Amino acid sequence: MESDSDDYDAGALKQYVRQKEKPKLFSLFKNPFSRKPVIYDTLQARLTCQDLVKAMQNQGFMHAGVSLNTTTEGKKLDAKYILHPGIPYVMGKVEYDVEDENIQNILHLDEPDNQNLKPGMRFSVEALDNERKRIANLLMDDGYFRFNKDFIYFSADTIAGQNDIALTLHLTKYKASSNAPETDHPRYQIRNINYLSNDSDRIHLRRQVLLNATALKEGRPYSASALQRTYNNFARLQAVKYTNIRFAEVPDSNRIAYVGESQNAGDDDFNRLLDCNIQVSTNKPSTISFQPEGTNTAGDFGAAASLTYTNRNLFRGSEQLSIEFRGAYEAITGLEGYQDQNYTEYSVEGKLVFPRFVAPFLSKNFRRRQTANSELSVSWD
């Protein structure tokens, strides 16, 4: 594959070629594990050309083309894809059309400093999709529980003979279903956070441990990033098998939303309330494992065994205590100057791992943000 433009990297699109050449590794020898020869398929070649054209158009080369040259020698065929990207298109005028006034007052997308798409930038589908994701993430971290990037789309306008594209980003209003009327997007505040257990009536973890692992906060807006951090924090706890987080909208919690800055949000800025239910399933706190093994050192046979006790929730804070007893025996034969024919070894190792940074004078906020572990270990041989 090659390009007729020196500035274009044709190798970056090699993944779009549907039929790959047979590997030449061990080609001089008969290799039973090599792949079968690839039979040239004209349909696959034509589809490859279409995929390559579409990939270049997505990068802003709207008039791109592909040529396919084939040469045959006996039963072998060489196919060469030649890319003709042409002149790339750039973004011209960029406008943001936000139908929801509350969202416009929060994001201020009419101000250039709050826009990632700028006139003169190379047009690409990836850049447009990244802007959709960016805006969606900002809103989903600011209380918009039911928002997603599908509420955002682009319209484009081109002028014949010019290589710039006028873009308009449209952010539509909320529709609960296809037949439902359009409304402003609901904004949610978390009312209560409840901790539930599958295993018993209560969770065998201290409440402060649960609170430190929960990035979501009561009285704060719903946040998708805080939700993911909460999942990650619980996954770090050795005492926890799995976590499932569900949200329930509070009935009759629809209130008139205040239109204003999100930084100065008060109780009336949110027109919906959510209850967050965190379901925690814990592992068995204690386990015992036994591992035998055989040894062979320079022809001297022996045996070893280890017995390990593990407690994953020592102080009801997901602290992990591990104590390992190990013994080994080996019969020594034919070693000159060695009197004792038997070699024995005993060892004990203990570890205590805290799922937090253990140090004095740490604030609660720091403890909740950090993800470090602290480990104490002692051994005897």
Regions found by a protein language model. Name each.
Residues 1-296, 326:
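Periplasmic polypeptide-binding modules associated with outer-membrane biogenesis and secretion
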Residues 71, 333-339, 362-366:
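Outer-membrane beta-barrel translocator domains and adjoining extracellular loop/strand segments
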Residues 274, 301-307, 344-350, 374:
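Hydrophobic, lipid-facing positions within transmembrane beta-strands of outer-membrane proteins
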Residues 286-296, 307, 318-337, 374-381:
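Transmembrane beta-strand segments that form the barrel wall of outer-membrane beta-barrel proteins
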Residues 311-313, 354, 380:
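Residue-level signature of outer-membrane beta-barrel architecture
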Residues 314-320, 357-373:
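Short loop/turn motifs that connect adjacent beta-strands in outer-membrane beta-barrel proteins
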Residues 323, 343, 348-350, 364-367:
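C-terminal structural cap/anchor segments
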